[in-house]
Design a protein with these regions (language model features):
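Glycine-rich, highly charged phosphate/nucleotide-binding loops
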Residues: 1-3, 53-83
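Mid-chain, well-packed structural core segment of small domains
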Residues: 70-106
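Rossmann-fold NAD(P)-binding glycine/threonine-rich loop
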Residues: 101-126
């Protein structure tokens, strides 16, 4: 998905983000992307069976065990691991399946879309939020990929 308006709408409407594969290690990309989103008003729910709590929130072993509503499922796992996560996202009634930079499972995205979810692949929620809502700066992960440019106008 490359449509700026759709990405902006997804990030504006999503308030609860379940991060699958979130690490408790501060230096991991999943941690600082989740921390950034939390600091920008999103509720971040951790999904990782290794931990009890991350970023002050209870950590769940799977998406299906999260009580309450999840708007966006953010996937920090290998491409091969995405299909069962997509199935869980469908089962819990999430609105968006978001695959992070380097994660691009077309079959999982197609399955999510067929079930009525929106699907984003190979993009970082932190980078897109910063780019689309005015927070893009020099802090981030050196992926050796320039994946984002400032839009011509900002939605303030």
């Amino acid at each position: 998905m490359d449509d700026i308006n759709t990405l902006r709408r997804i990030l504006r409407e999503s308030r609860v983000i379940a991060v699958v594969g979130l690490s408790a290690d501060w230096y991991r990309p999943s941690y600082f992307a989740a921390k950034y989103m939390q600091e920008h008003g999103y509720r971040v729910v951790s999904v990782n069976p290794k931990y009890g709590e991350i970023l002050g929130e209870k950590c769940y072993p799977s998406l299906r065990e999260i009580p309450g509503k999840v708007d966006l499922v953010d996937v920090f796992r290998k491409t091969a691991d995405v299909m069962p996560i997509a199935e869980d996202a469908i089962a819990i009634g999430a609105k968006v399946l978001w695959q992070q930079l380097g994660v691009k499972n077309e079959a999982a995205a197609a399955k999510a879309r067929a079930a009525g979810l929106e699907a984003v692949m190979d993009r970082c929620v932190k980078i897109e939020h910063g780019r689309l809502f005015g927070g893009l700066n020099w802090v981030g992960v050196n992926t050796h990929i320039i994946s984002a440019k400032r839009p011509r106008w900002l939605a303030y």
